Each structure stands twice: as C-alpha cells, then as structure tokens.
Amino acid sequence: MLRRAGVLEDVRRAGFVPKNWSFRKADGTPIVTIEDFAPSKSPDATTVLPIDTLGKILWCHALKNDHISVRWGCHVVDVGQDKDSAWVSVRENGGTEKIIKADFVCGCDGAASQVRKSLFGGEFRGKTWTDQMVATNVYYPFDEWGYDDLNTLIDPDDWHIVARLTKDGLWRVSYRQDGSKSLREVLDEHPARFEHLLPGHPKPDDYTILNISPYRLHQRSAEKYRVGRICLAADAAHLCNPWGGLGLTGGFADAIGLSECLIGIHMGRADHSILDKYDEVRRAIYWNFTDPISTSNFMRVSTSDPETILEKDPVMATFARMHEDSKIREDFDRVCSHPNIFVDLASLSQHIYGILHDFTQYYSTGKGQASL
C-alpha cells in the first residue's frame, strides 16, 4: 500500500528494518525468538517508523499534489448533505463556523470522530477491554540487557511490549494498567511500574521519557461506513487493540479501497452504488478478520500462562519449531511481513490478503487492478 502511494522509499529511508522478535516472560526470560523476522531481504520487509514521522512524510507528499489542500486548526462541528453535494461545518482556529462543500465527505477523523457522531450519535458497536494500555517513548539501554528489536512479554498481570523505534535508541514501552485507574493515578504509579517491569529495575534518573499516553483498548465498528455522500474510514469507522498492527493497516486498506471507489465514480466507470459495496466489504472485513485476529493476538499476550504457552498455543509452538523445520521457516519468511502474523501458518496463505479488497473489479468496464 505504501509502495502504491509512492511513499515507501521515504519510509524506508527514515525508518529501519528490525532484526529479531522475542516472546518473553514478564521478567525478560526468553520463551521463543524469531530471528530476522522482517525478513530483511524481502522487498516487503517490515519497517519500523514512529507514526509522527510517517505523518510528516505523508504530509510532505500531499503538499506536492495540486489537488490536495491542508487546513490546520479545523474543528469539525457537523456534517450534512443533499442530493447533489455534502459538506462539513468547521470552526477554524476557534473562529466562527464555516461550511466546506464537496461532492463527498470522507470522515477519517479518528476514534472520537465527529463525522461518525454526526451520523450515528453515540452508537459505536462493540466492547472496551477492562485493561488500559500506557504507551511511552523512552530512552533506556535495553540492548545491554539482551533485548531484541521487538519483545512481547506475556503475563496476565504484567503483559507489555518493548520495541525499538529509532536508530538512535528510542524505544516504545507499552504496558498494562488497571482500567479503573484515573489519569492522575496512572502518572503517579508510572515510575513504580517501570521499576517493576524494565530490566535492571531502573529509577527515574536512569531513563528519559519523551512522552507517556494512557489509552483504552476497544473492539468497535460503526453501523455503516457509508451514508449517502458521507463515508467513514480507519479509526473513525472501526477500532481494535494494537496487537498485530491491524488498526493502522486496516486504515490504510480502507483509504485505498475508498479511493478506488471515488476514482471509479469520478472516471464514470462506477455509479454511487459502489460506495455501498465499500460499506459492505470493509465492515465484513472488520468483523470477520480484523476483530477476531486482533482479539486472538491480545488474548495470547494477556491471558496465557508463559510457563505452558509453548505446549498449549499452536502458533507459539510453530514459532518454536521454525529453528528445526526449514519448511516452516520458509513459509514464515514468505508471509510474515503482512499484518495477520499470528494466524496459524498452515492457513496463513489463504488469509494473507484478508484485510485488502480490490474495488476496481466493480467498475462497469475493465477487469480491475489489484490493490497492492
């Protein structure tokens, strides 16, 4: 998807291809390690890049397109439509409201989407997990403690993830916190949580935190992704927990699919009913693919006994056998850069494009073109 958008080279240049991925007990003891999990030689190798840096790259590319304009400081107040157009009512930089009118409105305004709320009120089907996650970006020498580029630490009470973010030693540490804790309580307890979870049991003077952000974990989807001339995509349309990276990847897939539909309409190769197909297909992908797989990923990390997971979890057992079975390793290398990494490798090939869909196949002429 990034290659098709013309941004992959810049993403590769700014980020890095990670090496090993380790599953560990909460105290850091390795359970199983996947070496060169990206894999580094693949043209589709996993690339690590902080989301704010990715945003800057996408913005710079958008500025080069004469058909795109970017307005900062716009707060969406409401949306509306008639038979010929759709519009957004915005308050720009705290000023008076103004109307921005277009043929279509695409709400990509995140989990708290005002576009979605304007369409459906507070209705957002699904659930919120009991635990909350505290995401931090921190400088701390995890290398000195034998940690790999990606570390998933499995424990019902102390699950967390430690992942290298940048080449200069910035790491993402995201850990479990009781969902009943207030923001003040989360911040007050943070030093003790770090001392408990991190190798070496560091004090605050031993690390440098750039930011800390607690947030709730959800599995939710809007009732519809299309209402007339107004569409929803990405977090505005659906939410999932972050294990497996299906939230961001699913958002990209939504954007690709919706753009194919709108391009088809613009070119006269599809009528507005193609947007019903977008709604139908993307919602089905969420409920049949994104939601169950991300849920399974999270349950593996948050409910498994790390002492017995290799015996009881077939996916983890498969990862462990890769060191001895070259065929399993070859299959893993072929598919592991895709988001549905935790699907059983035996059935992974049939799910590899499960989050994608080619909407050009619904054009009135032509056979359509693949979405990647």
Swiss-Prot record:
Q: Which SUPFAM superfamilies match?
A: FAD/NAD(P)-binding domain (SSF51905)
Question: Which InterPro entries did the record assign?
Answer: FAD-bd, FAD/NAD-bd_sf, RIFMO-like
Q: Which family does it belong to?
A: Belongs to the PheA/TfdB FAD monooxygenase family.
Q: Which cofactor does it need?
A: FAD
- Residues at which FAD binds: 76, 172-174, 215, 235
PANTHER family annotated for this entry? BINDING MONOOXYGENASE, PUTATIVE (JCVI)-RELATED, TRK SYSTEM POTASSIUM UPTAKE PROTEIN
Entry's Gene Ontology molecular function annotations: FAD binding; oxidoreductase activity, acting on paired donors, with incorporation or reduction of molecular oxygen, NAD(P)H as one donor, and incorporation of one atom of oxygen
Physiological role? FAD-dependent monooxygenase; part of the gene cluster that mediates the biosynthesis of terrein, a fungal metabolite with ecological, antimicrobial, antiproliferative, and antioxidative activities. The first step in the pathway is performed by the polyketide synthase terA that produces 4-hydroxy-6-methylpyranon (4-HMP), orsellinic acid (OA), and 2,3-dehydro-6-hydroxymellein (2,3-dehydro-6-HM) by condensing acetyl-CoA with two, three, or four malonyl-CoA units, respectively. 4-HMP and OA are not pathway intermediates, but are rather shunt or side products.
Uses: Terrein shows anticancer activity on various tumors including cervical carcinoma, ovarian cancer, and head and neck cancer. The secondary metabolite acts as angiogenesis inhibitors through the inhibition of angiogenin secretion. Terrein also has anti-inflammatory activity. It shows an alleviative function of age-related inflammation characterized as an anti-oxidant and might therefore be a useful nutraceutical compound for anti-aging. Terrein may enhance osseointegration by decreasing the level of ROS and has a potentially synergistic effect on osteoblast differentiation.
Q: Which Gene3D superfamilies would you find in this protein's record?
A: 3.30.70.2450, FAD/NAD(P)-binding domain
Query: Does Flavoprotein appear among the keywords?
Result: yes
Q: Does the keyword Flavoprotein apply?
A: yes
Q: What are the EC numbers?
A: 1.-.-.-
Keywords from UniProt, A to Z, are: FAD, Flavoprotein, Monooxygenase, Oxidoreductase
Question: Which conditions up-regulate this protein?
Answer: Expression is induced by methionine. Nitrogen starvation induces expression of terC and promotes terrein production during fruit infection, via regulation by areA and atfA. Iron limitation acts as a third independent signal for terrein cluster induction via the iron response regulator hapX. Finally, expression is under the control of the terrein cluster-specific transcription factor terR.
Q: In which pathway does it act?
A: Secondary metabolite biosynthesis
User: What is the top EC class of this enzyme, as a single word?
Assistant: oxidoreductase
Matching Pfam families, A to Z? FAD_binding_3 (PF01494)
Q: What is this protein called?
A: FAD-dependent monooxygenase terC
Q: What happens when the gene is disrupted?
A: Impairs the production of terrein.
Originating organism: Aspergillus terreus (strain NIH 2624 / FGSC A1156)
